[in-house]
Amino acid sequence: MSDDALNLDEDSKEVIDTMMNTIEKPCPTKKVKGRLNNHRVYLAGPIDHASDDGVGWREELTPYLEKMGLTILDPTNKPVSQCRYNEIGDEKEHIQKLVNLKRWDELREMAKEIVLVDLRMVEVADFLIAYVDKDIHICGTYDEIFESLRRRKPTLIVHKGGKAEMSMWLRGK
């Protein structure tokens, strides 16, 4: 995985390197891929205000996680047919048009469905990996992190800027 593509600081690189070294170790038996095999991971992180709609870091991390036998639950690539809306691509342009037209009721209905599906993915995930950048507004990411923690799921937070830049709320969770 390219550190430059994610623009990570040293603490974040260390966390990801440690995680990758741990999950990429070969399993001693051929029957079982590893502890993570057949588990589901939700990838939380900025979407609305991310320059690439939050797709880049997820696409970069996904092959490593799939190699470990994980099922990826990605809000930028929803694996469910029940959600009619997505927050990226053409749908993002449509959302912006509705904002410009001040069609708040329609936007609220769309947002409710997006939130419902994303939080349902957090609910069915076995653990969560969250990418947090203090310079990007991440309302949904915080909700997903706190939902994961309320459900007592393992929650890995990769914070751009490292521990020194992390919010006291995240430290307290």
List each model region and its residues.
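Conserved catalytic or regulatory cores that recognize and/or transform ribose-phosphate-containing ligands
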Residues: S2-K173
